[in-house]
């Protein structure tokens, strides 16, 4: 059965790559993380992505992530606004976690390419994504490819995207482009139909929206969520102040990037969030 992705089911706009809270023994602090996700949605962002780079996703076990998903349901977190990082060097782990997310009602999986062995061919990367899709065999699955070459050292080529879209047009839903090259984002917006492009930084939020992209998935949205929301609302309503709102948001991003410095976004943003909330528990990183 050839089912197309319905426009109304996609998560578009301002999405935050959520931080993950940990307890003193480094175990996952499920309640604090979910509460933070609810706070983000209260800032009127459009979606929350758990267990990405900023969420220290690769430091968590599949068991921990599955338990977290179970708690999202128990705590009535809106799953239609949820995306889960499920990528792994292990195809079996990626399939197990994506399957659990799907059966729980979360359709969008953010999938990193296998990243430990460098310089894989497009053929090898195609085989990885293809294997996940075929093993899951679920028409509801929406894979958002994660392009972050500075960290993974595995870039996602346009040829690979084209081939995946040709063979899995109803499953390869989009890409989070954290490469920092806005021309690459705009090129994908132009060249790939029915393919949602998310800027990996709110700096490129408006240009991507104007090119027909889906929006942004941003780490600093943990702090700038409200202003990200304002930009998207202004864009949708054709507010003439949208450029000024974007400029303000870009300035915030630059300040936060500088403030986080060499410690990186995860620990740096946690320090800022801890200070803002007067909550030392947010200082804990894995």
For each feature predicted by the language model, list its residue ranges:
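Alpha-helix boundary/capping detector
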Residues: 66, 98, 127, 191, ...
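Active-site beta->alpha loop and helix N-cap motifs at the rims of alpha/beta catalytic domains
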Residues: 2-153
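A general structural signal for well-ordered alpha-helical segments in protein cores
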Residues: 33, 65, 69, 94, ...
